[in-house]
Amino acid sequence: MTDPSAQHSAPPLATVADIMRPPVTAVEQNDHVGAAAYLMKRADATALIVTQAQTGQPVGIITEADISHAVADGKNPNDVRIYQMMTARPTVVNISTSIRDAAKVMTSGRFRHLPVMGDAGLVGIVDITDVCRALLEADVSGSSADTAQPEQSSPH
């Protein structure tokens, strides 16, 4: 007969909560794209959550790629409003979403950033680097990507 105290429970599943970066840097939808670029540089971020000016509620996301496309199209970032360039109603994941499932969402949707939602609303953001790092660390350690416990990445 086996001693019940000798049995080990499975490690907890690693979720986006383990790798996300709170707090999220936000910018208002009516600000200029140039202001978003400045905030990204200051916060060392590659994406910002866009909020509605009156309520502060998240309404979109703007990324480095969005800003690059505006500049490549000959637009002056100080003449373009964020709402004109942002992705409205971006795909989000729940705080309990596994890292593997987040990778699937990112791959199928070709997303580089995913806002993370909790019971109280927006709680963080994960990017493709966070997810890849966690998957690589899980692979190197020989564990499942769903059971890896990656180190917290540096804040953006």
Please provide the spans of the model-predicted regions.
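Tandem CBS (Cystathionine beta-synthase) repeat/Bateman regulatory domains
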Residues: 1-156
